[in-house]
From Swiss-Prot:
List of residues that carry Phosphoserine: S763, S783
Gene: NUP100
Free-text note regarding domains: Contains FG repeats. FG repeats are interaction sites for karyopherins (importins, exportins) and form probably an affinity gradient, guiding the transport proteins unidirectionally with their cargo through the NPC. FG repeat regions are highly flexible and lack ordered secondary structure. The overall conservation of FG repeats regarding exact sequence, spacing, and repeat unit length is limited.
GO terms for MF: molecular condensate scaffold activity; nuclear localization sequence binding; RNA binding; structural constituent of nuclear pore
Pfam family, one: Nucleoporin2
Polar residues bias spans: 12-36, 137-153, 192-245, 294-303, 353-377, 679-697, 777-790
UniProt protein name: Nucleoporin NUP100/NSP100
UniProt membrane topology term: Peripheral membrane protein
Residues annotated as domain Peptidase S59: 814-956
Similarity annotation: Belongs to the nucleoporin GLFG family.
Amino acid sequence: MFGNNRPMFGGSNLSFGSNTSSFGGQQSQQPNSLFGNSNNNNNSTSNNAQSGFGGFTSAAGSNSNSLFGNNNTQNNGAFGQSMGATQNSPFGSLNSSNASNGNTFGGSSSMGSFGGNTNNAFNNNSNSTNSPFGFNKPNTGGTLFGSQNNNSAGTSSLFGGQSTSTTGTFGNTGSSFGTGLNGNGSNIFGAGNNSQSNTTGSLFGNQQSSAFGTNNQQGSLFGQQSQNTNNAFGNQNQLGGSSFGSKPVGSGSLFGQSNNTLGNTTNNRNGLFGQMNSSNQGSSNSGLFGQNSMNSSTQGVFGQNNNQMQINGNNNNSLFGKANTFSNSASGGLFGQNNQQQGSGLFGQNSQTSGSSGLFGQNNQKQPNTFTQSNTGIGLFGQNNNQQQQSTGLFGAKPAGTTGSLFGGNSSTQPNSLFGTTNVPTSNTQSQQGNSLFGATKLTNMPFGGNPTANQSGSGNSLFGTKPASTTGSLFGNNTASTTVPSTNGLFGNNANNSTSTTNTGLFGAKPDSQSKPALGGGLFGNSNSNSSTIGQNKPVFGGTTQNTGLFGATGTNSSAVGSTGKLFGQNNNTLNVGTQNVPPVNNTTQNALLGTTAVPSLQQAPVTNEQLFSKISIPNSITNPVKATTSKVNADMKRNSSLTSAYRLAPKPLFAPSSNGDAKFQKWGKTLERSDRGSSTSNSITDPESSYLNSNDLLFDPDRRYLKHLVIKNNKNLNVINHNDDEASKVKLVTFTTESASKDDQASSSIAASKLTEKAHSPQTDLKDDHDESTPDPQSKSPNGSTSIPMIENEKISSKVPGLLSNDVTFFKNNYYISPSIETLGNKSLIELRKINNLVIGHRNYGKVEFLEPVDLLNTPLDTLCGDLVTFGPKSCSIYENCSIKPEKGEGINVRCRVTLYSCFPIDKETRKPIKNITHPLLKRSIAKLKENPVYKFESYDPVTGTYSYTIDHPVLT
């Protein structure tokens, strides 16, 4: 592994640099090392075995390989160094003597510490020994990185610089910094020496160059070739290719530097970035960036070439490559201006002549400057330059050349600047023109649309659509068509030309008028810029009838064919654009603004408003004379006839009208107590009498009215059923109140009247009246003292019909409700007495009754609403304050403890749907049990024969 004849990485004698190497390196004649150093000599007569890293040596008669590829004729060291018959050091340093031991780092007894042989402290080797990394040579020794020297007595520097004399640290020949006094020594940064040497590459592929890559006819770090190959930036070199595409013919380094073939005596060195410097004579030493000097001169850091004779005869160059002679020496500047070479620029531009390309593809032939001159080639964005030596400024200003500017300007004679300002001569000659970034064409336009000249020119397109010699519009509708002058518009519609026929319409309808009118066209806001059309006037969006209308109806001028359009607010402007005019315009064309503003020839022309938009607004003549309100006289007859009632109906209803019910038998305070008649009657009053009594609003105006006694007397003709022929019978009084002072005659008459009433009670008419008039006793006469006569028998008869009614002071209503005490009794009580009414009973003859067991307060309760309104009965049910929103609290009003008795509360048989009256029926017992379990009511009694159910409740009003 560390000294066998077979390589480690499996290469069959060709590991890394041959046609069958592991990493695909290919060569035609000679194998390559890892770093592309080709070690081929005229004296190699044996098969060269290759190491693992591609380095080989051509020691005669021996093909043994080490780990790092050193081919030695003798035993191999640990790192592949070749040793004759000597012992190896730990790092394989080989000594040239047969009995000497290797030192620590592989240096021989007369060598340096890093593997260089005897000559120099920095590894200059004069014997045929190998460096630690396996670079081998028959007569010369390699340095630390394997650079070798072709001289039999030559030495190698640390980075592979080779010269005929002693090499410095960085490969310079002569002193450490390469400055020769009378000779042609190289400086520290790669100025080459004039001595001829073989074409072996250093670490970066430089052949006999300094540390920074000055090379003679071989590839640099980025593959710059001296003849025709291409480097990383497209320069074509004739030799092999690097990893960036440059392919040398011979062996290449890691980055594609080509090491020249045998027999080449011209040292052509390349720079760091692949600049190639070729020369026909002598050794051309290159600088850091590949500048070439013709003679044996010293170059600066950036490869500047100085051909004049300086002190001690040296040709010294300046810092940026400016040559100090007037000879034909070709040297490249800082940005890659190169002479006498053929290559492509960074982006692939190709040059016609033998000039190299700069950073942006500028191709310079002979005398390039830093920023200006350039040769024919392709620019950054693809512009073609086909003329001879032309120099272009930073923004594309180029005098009389075909080179385009940075932003795409291309012209044969007159280039364009950044904003399109053209550097034109004073004469009005025709020329081809290029376009700037914003489309301003040269020869005519200023940066903002000014028109300097009226020369004829070609056409070009801009970014915003400005195109001369065409009929297309730009983004904002500016048309730049012209037959004589390019009609280019500014960014905001400024027309910076002298064209006579521009017919396109802008985005908002701004249209430059011309001699030829379009048929139709209206702006977005109704801007119509044509004064005449073939179809008719164009209406704006707001209904304006004028031709050229702005946003608010302002119209442009219609005076000439100069094409004036309306602005946003109707201002008319007949002046030119904001650009400075150097030449008077041919035709006075007005300019178009962004929103269609129009120029007006004079300020005396009054603005025209839109009739449709402001037709409804009355504009006063002045502020001091406002429009006054119109007044009209009112006729006296109209004033007299007008009244407050004219706003109402001709026959309005009265607010409070009495009830028109004639069927009511008993009325109190204009209020009928009959619920059926009250429900069916029609009242003209706005307010309901019932609601008025519920709210007690009537008592507000007449508080003593309630205590007045009202007597309603009606003549009942049906009572005269008994015809008496004598005068005595005619004098009989129906109802009298007997007193102790009454005479016997009065007692006799009273007994007769009682007997007659008994007969009348059994008559059919009396029975008929029982159904209708039992609740309204009809007094027919008065006593001498004026008291009312009440038939007591009637009360007894009615009381006998109502079960459980003990008192005779009862008032019955036609809806079968009754109340006790009667309404008359309750009405005669004072306010204090109404606050405590005992034994109040409200009932229905068919459904049941309610007996209040505690005194009730009827002061705030309307009496006629107790029966049927506040207390309602139904089959097997009784409810109090059911339909009222305002309910009394517990213990107030009638919300006190009471006993409720319901009639006919029989359970219903589900099969027959009939009440169960059998006292032994099981459902009856079950129904009684449910009644007892009711938690709200307290069960008292149930009569199964009559079906009377009685219970008590503490607070009957359910809140």
